[in-house]
């Protein structure tokens, strides 16, 4: 898992951060730990050793810039070299809203291409454009049905042939006509092996027909450094590959290897799949990615996620909080918002100091606790939600029984409510809660049992 890589790298860097004195011996020891962490994540050994030499050279020879301590300088060197390993710069998907764009998705069978087509449609939808999908994979029996279910979930038009009697080229040609009103057409092509010349020829025919704005190669993140050969083969067959989307990074022990391998052949990685949900697709930014796995956070992405799930009820709740009203009704709305943002592990990794060494159990406990808190509040009357101070012995007993929990858990919820209310009170008065203060207390109450 990538969180294992992050944990190992963070532990290595902590040796530098916690040291009273940094010498050559410590630098070499930390570099060995970094090498081990990267090789375990299936990063190419040659790449790892070349990077290690650079880290060692800079850490020993370079003087820290003004304003940075020796320890901070070494941590920055490691961070910069890890970013370089993954491609250094961010490559964005450029779409012109004034004209129709066509995206052709290619890749071998089992890479997660069909799911990625829906995720990409959702991503484009959130950017304010109208996407449409074409199911051009007639070789895999469940491909059309899978894309149909996903497209209905995100309310995106789909064209395909459920009978599978038409050729992919015929389906694509008809689909281009039917989806005239959309801004971006995403075509899910048949999964193919890099050696299947017939299918590659068909893909080239579809490329000539659609004149795509971008061809995106979908690669399975569980392949590790083998991803390099796959990307290279497709790039040689279809030289116009515009970018790469790496899937299944949330559950892969070889994710680091896949990313570094693809970056090595100078094929820009534009997207990464970080979960099974249609919203679990992210624009790939090497700097943000490394920041998160090292536990440094990614507040920009966290804010983007928050904006994506903001709805009218959430805005009303925030408006009430800013006016000084914070009851269990507002707390419930906040927990609903957090639940919509995605896996708790992913959210917490975006908060500085909360990623890297975060135990998996803590993230799971947080997610479970959120669900239990909502169940408890569902067992309360409106009067109790508006006036939590009314919840005394008899009411406590009734609510606990209705929610199927112990009375101590209701008390735990009320304690969490009180802490959160105080934090929002400070926010209203212009004091930003710090991770080490009240905000840290809020997160600890959610993450750990008392």
Curated annotation (Swiss-Prot):
Enzymatic reactions: GTP + H2O = GDP + phosphate + H(+)
Chief localization: cytoplasm
GO terms assigned for molecular function: 7S RNA binding; ATP hydrolysis activity; GTP binding; GTPase activity
InterPro entries: AAA+_ATPase, P-loop_NTPase, Signal_recog_part_SRP54_M_sf, Signal_recog_particl_SRP54_hlx, Signal_recog_particle_SRP54_M, SRP/SRP_N, SRP54, SRP54_GTPase_dom
One annotated GO biological process: SRP-dependent cotranslational protein targeting to membrane
EC numbers: 3.6.5.4
Enzyme class: hydrolase
Binding residues for GTP: 107-114, 188-192, 247-250
Keywords: Cytoplasm, GTP-binding, Hydrolase, Nucleotide-binding, Ribonucleoprotein, RNA-binding, Signal recognition particle
GO cellular component, one term: signal recognition particle
Top-level lineage group: Archaea
Location relative to the cell: Cytoplasm
Domain notes: Composed of three domains: the N-terminal N domain, which is responsible for interactions with the ribosome, the central G domain, which binds GTP, and the C-terminal M domain, which binds the RNA and the signal sequence of the RNC.
PANTHER family for this protein: SIGNAL RECOGNITION PARTICLE 54K PROTEIN SRP54, SIGNAL RECOGNITION PARTICLE SUBUNIT SRP54
The family this protein is said to belong to: Belongs to the GTP-binding SRP family. SRP54 subfamily.
Function field: Involved in targeting and insertion of nascent membrane proteins into the cytoplasmic membrane. Binds to the hydrophobic signal sequence of the ribosome-nascent chain (RNC) as it emerges from the ribosomes. The SRP-RNC complex is then targeted to the cytoplasmic membrane where it interacts with the SRP receptor FtsY.
Quaternary structure and partners: Part of the signal recognition particle protein translocation system, which is composed of SRP and FtsY. Archaeal SRP consists of a 7S RNA molecule of 300 nucleotides and two protein subunits: SRP54 and SRP19.
Protein's UniProt name: Signal recognition particle 54 kDa protein
Record organism: Methanococcus maripaludis (strain C7 / ATCC BAA-1331)
Lineage, opening ranks: Archaea, Methanobacteriati, Methanobacteriota, Methanomada group, Methanococci
């Amino acid at each position: 898992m990538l969180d294992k890589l992050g944990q190992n790298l963070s532990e290595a860097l902590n040796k530098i951060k916690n040291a009273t004195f940094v010498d050559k011996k410590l630098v070499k020891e930390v570099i060995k730990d970094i090498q081990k962490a990267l090789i375990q994540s299936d990063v190419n050994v040659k790449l790892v050793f070349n990077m290690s030499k650079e880290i060692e050279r800079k850490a020993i020879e370079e003087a820290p810039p003004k304003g940075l301590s020796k320890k901070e300088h070494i941590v920055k060197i490691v961070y910069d070299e890890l970013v370089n390993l993954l491609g250094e710069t961010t490559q964005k998907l450029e779409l012109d809203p004034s004209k129709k764009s066509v995206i052709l998705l290619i890749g071998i069978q089992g890479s997660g291409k069909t799911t990625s087509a829906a995720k990409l449609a959702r991503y484009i939808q959130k950017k304010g454009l109208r996407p449409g999908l074409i199911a051009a994979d007639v070789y895999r029996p469940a491909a059309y049905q899978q894309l149909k279910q996903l497209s209905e979930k995100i309310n995106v038009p789909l064209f395909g042939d459920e009978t599978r009697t038409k050729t992919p080229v015929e389906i694509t040609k008809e689909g281009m006509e039917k989806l005239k009103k959309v801004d971006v057409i995403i075509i899910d092509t048949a999964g193919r092996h890099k050696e299947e010349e017939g299918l590659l020829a068909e893909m080239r025919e579809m490329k000539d027909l659609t004149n795509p704005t971008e061809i995106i190669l979908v690669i399975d993140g569980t392949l590790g450094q083998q991803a390099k050969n796959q990307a290279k083969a497709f790039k040689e067959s279809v030289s116009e590959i515009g970018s790469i989307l790496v899937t299944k990074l949330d559950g892969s022990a070889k994710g680091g290897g896949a990313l570094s391998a693809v970056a090595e052949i100078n094929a820009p990685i534009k997207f990464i799949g970080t979960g099974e949900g249609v919203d679990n697709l992210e624009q790939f930014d090497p700097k943000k990615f490394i920041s998160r796995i090292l536990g440094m956070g990614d507040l920009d992405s966290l804010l983007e996620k928050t904006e994506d799930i903001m709805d009218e009820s959430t805005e009303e709740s925030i408006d009430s909080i800013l006016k000084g009203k914070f009851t269990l009704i507002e707390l419930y709305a906040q927990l609903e918002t957090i639940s919509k943002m995605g896996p708790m592990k992913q959210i917490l990794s975006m908060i500085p100091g909360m990623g890297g060494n975060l135990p998996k159990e803590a993230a799971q406990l947080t997610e479970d606790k959120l669900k239990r808190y909502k169940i408890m509040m569902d067992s309360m009357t409106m009067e109790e939600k508006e006036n939590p101070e009314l919840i005394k012995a008899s009411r406590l007993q009734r609510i606990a029984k209705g929610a199927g929990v112990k009375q101590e858990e209701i008390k735990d919820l009320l304690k969490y409510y009180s802490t959160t209310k105080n934090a929002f009170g400070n926010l209203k008065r212009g004091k930003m809660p710090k991770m080490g203060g009240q905000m840290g207390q809020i997160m600890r109450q959610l993450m750990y049992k008392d």
